[in-house]
Amino acid sequence: MKKLNGKLKHNIAVFLSGRGSNLKSIIKYSLRKEKFYKVKVVISNKQKVKGLSIAKKNNIQSYCIDFTQSKRLGNKVLNILKKNNIKLICLAGFMKILPAYFIKSYKGKIINIHPSLLPKYKGLNTHKRVIMNNEKFTGCTIHYVNRFLDSGKIIIQRKVKITKKDTSKSIEKKVLKIEHSIYPKTIDKILSIL
């Protein structure tokens, strides 16, 4: 934990599998003096993704370890997190399911952002399914991670209106915009009470 302006900053880890757009907004928000966290570690299950480049550009430790199918590699990741005093794991476009033993090690301290208004549209291809079902609204959900897919306790949701002109791409852009706004603030709020 780092002390800044008399406040303690909690170390967080961000897990991702791709472009890292949420990572970028989380880092930017965390750099404000009065915020409660610092991105200390980034873990990706894929090599050569933009998210790892964003981490390196911001001098954040980053690792490419596809650990979800190997307990040995999972323990390696847990050791990295422990060594860096990680208080919260934030999944941001992490496209793997965490093993039960891993979730148990950080019980109540892993959150995820999902691009739908859960419990509707768990899993992949949410925007296409929203259009197919003629939904009037969609949005994003931040929730605690448990052993079931996109089923943990909901922390916060934000919705956006769907118009007749919307496509899955335009909906993705709308939802991503609100994700970038609420995810960093929600992380800060959770850590402010730890």
Residue positions per predicted region:
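One-carbon transfer enzymes
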Residues: 1-194
